[in-house]
Amino acid sequence: MPRPTHPYVSTWQGWLYVAFVIDVFARRIVGWRVSSSMRTDFVLDALEQALYARQPERDGGLIHHSDRGSQVVSIRYSERLSEAGVEPSVGSKGDSYDNALAETINGLYKAELIHRRAPWKTKEAVELATLEWVSWFNNHRLLEPIGYIPPAEAEANYYRQLAKQVAIAA
């Protein structure tokens, strides 16, 4: 039986698995994927979405922290992180506190969406609902650790402040 906060979703067609890639600074979900299998391609798709959103070759200095799941410690996944110039960081085995932000996001996802709208019939229904939830989460969900504002606002505030500092320095 899946652990309660892990993003597994029961549907009439069987179990689905959900992967999120989260920007820790602003708590923004920058990549996600729903899959009927736990293969490496599943988490690679979420990673590719995040890499496209964040363009690490432009910004540099990115660190990817994850649990010790077989998908994220696979050779292909590690190679892709390296190609993108992203530093891998892997947590302790069985330590939910080591990846507390991911556990929190997974729990919110299940409480605010999955359990509230169950039962789920199809993968497509879960994908569409997840797309809508991620957009709502990033743009409207107030989060205490970032000052009771949504992740998109926290990120916009950071870049606005950065632009001011650059203008002052020029």
Label the model's feature ranges.
Residues 1-170:
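Charged DNA-binding/catalytic regions of mobile-element recombinases
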